[in-house]
C-alpha cells in the first residue's frame, strides 16, 4: 500500500526514472527483516519443556529416596556395603534408562509418517509440537487456494452465467439460472466474449499426462481455459498487439477476420477502462446502446464476491489495417465481463472443518485485498466477520492488538512485521502457534512461531531455513494431516511413559518394602543370610528388556479413533499429573505385591531349619520374584496399549510388535532361568525353577491387567459425570 517506493532488492524491468535513496543497510525493508530475525529467539517446544520439568522432578525424587533409603538401612542395622547396594538397587530400579532413546525413536517414526504425508520435519521435537497446536496462521494464495485463476462468472448480453470446474483442466459447464446451456446456442455475445479472452492473450494451456498447466500469466490462463470449456481452440493470425501495461489497464490485439474484407480488434482490461472505449454493446446478436450503469453494477457485484473482473470488447476494421495503435481503440463494441478467482483447494474445506472439530483455530494472514480475503474466508468457513488490514494494524499498539487478536480470523494487506506481531500476541495469549510462509519477509514470523511451516514448492531458501517444517505440496490439508500425526506421536509418548514409570516404580517399591521389613523378616535381612527380592543386575536386565522389547512396541501403536475430535491439550499440562500419579501408584503397588508374595512364599522355607541348601532356595525364590516382575510387565503391556480405551475394544493383532516383544521377552527369560545356569554362565544369579512354580507366578501376574482395565472404566465414567452440561 506504499506508492512511489522501490524497495532494496527490487528489479526494474521496464522504463526509466530517477529515485532518491531514503534508507540503506539495516534501515531498508530487507534490513528490517534481518533485524527481526536476529531479535527472534527460537522457543523451546512444549514437549522439551515438559520432559525437562519431568526429568528434574524424577532426578530429585530418586536421589532423595535413595539417600533416605541408605540412612534408613544404616539405622536398621545394615552394614554400609549392604545399605549402599540396596540404595543403588532402588535408584537403578527407579530410573528408566531406556526412556530417552524410546522418545527419540518415537519422534523419528512420527517424522517419517509426516514425510509420507508431504510434511518434512527439520527438528524432531517439532513433530510433537504440531499435536498441541491451537492456532494455525496460514497464507492464502497457494496454501488455502490452488494458485490457479479460474473464471467463475460471465456477464454478457444482459445475462449472467456461472462456469463450473476449477483449475486449469478445460472441463466445465455453463449455467444460466438453473439450466446448463451450450454457449454456441446462446447469442453471439457470449461466444465473442469468450473468444476475445482467448484471442487477446499470450498464455497457452499445456497438457502433460492429463495434468494441465499454464505457460504464461495466470489471469490470461484462466481466459484460455474458459474459452476451451466452450469448445474454442483455434486462433486466427495475430497481426499486431498493444501489450498490457498496468498504467493503461488494457491489452489489445489485431487479428485477421473471418471475412475477406475485415480484420478484428480484440480488447480486454479493467471494466472501467474498457467501457470508456466503447460506444455500444452486443445483445442477442444485435448492436444496442451501451448500458454502462448496468455493466458497472455487475462488475461491482463480481468484485464484491472476490472475483477479478475483466471487460471484453471488439471492433471490426478494414482488411487494409495491419497495425494497431491506441487511437484505433475508440468506438469499440462491448461484449461482456469475465470474473475469475483463485479457487480454494477442494481438500482444504474439509481440512478446515477438521481443525474446528479438533479445537484448532485457523487464521488467514494474506497480502491480498480485504474483500478477496473475506470472500475466501467465507467459502472456507474460517470466519470473515472481522477483517483487520495492515494499515489498521500499524495504528495499533501491541496491547491493543493483544486485546482483539483472539477474535480476528482474517488479516489482509499485511506486511512482514504485522505477521510477526500477530504471531507474538497470539503466543502471549497462551496459544501454540503454527505459521506458514514462503517469502524472505516471512522468515521472522516463521522463526518466532512455535512451529514455522515453509512452502516446499514456492518457498524461498530463507523461509525454509527459518522453518521447522516444510510442506512439499504447499497444501494446507497436509498441515492438518501433520497435526493428526503430531497428536499420535504424543499419545504414543504418553503410553510409553505411563508404561515405563509405573513398572520402574514397582521395582523400587519392592526393594523399599523389603528393606523396611528386613528387621522383622529374616528372608530380607543380609545379616541372617537373606537377600533383597531382586538383584541390581536383574533390575538392569528388566529395565533393558522393558525398553527394547516391551516399551518400544508401544510406539508402533496405530492411531486411535477420534484423534482430531479431541480439543488440543493444554500447553501448560504436565506429564506428571494426578492421573499419572494414580496409575504409577496402582501399578507399582500391584507389581511390588506380586514380587513380594512369590519371593516370600518360596523363600521362607529356607529358614525352616530342615533345608539342606538354603542358598539354592533363596536363589530360586529370587529367580521366581524376578520372573514374576517380568510377567507383570508383560500383562501390563497389553492394557497399556491405550490410556483410556479398554484393551478388549481393539484386536490383539493390530500391533504385531507387542506380541513379538512379549514372546521375545518370555523366551529370553526362559533362557536366563534354564539355559545359562546349565552351561555355567550365570551373571544374573538365577536358578532353574520347578514347573509347578509357574502356576502361582502367572496367577499373581494377571490381576494387573484387570485392575487397570477396571481403573480405565471408572475414570471414563467419572469424566462423563464431570462433563459440563450445555
Feature map (PLM): residue ranges:
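Membrane-interface interhelical connector segments
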Residues: 606-615
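Membrane-water interface at loop-to-transmembrane-helix junctions
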Residues: 570-590, 615-624
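C-terminal substrate-binding/catalytic lobe of Rossmann-fold NAD(P)-dependent dehydrogenases
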Residues: 598-605, 618, 630
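Conserved cytosolic headpiece of P-type ATPases
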Residues: 1-568, 573-576, 589, 626, ...
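Alpha-helical transmembrane segments of multi-pass integral membrane proteins
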Residues: 516, 582-598, 631, 667
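A C-terminal functional module that forms or caps the active site or interfaces directly
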Residues: 640
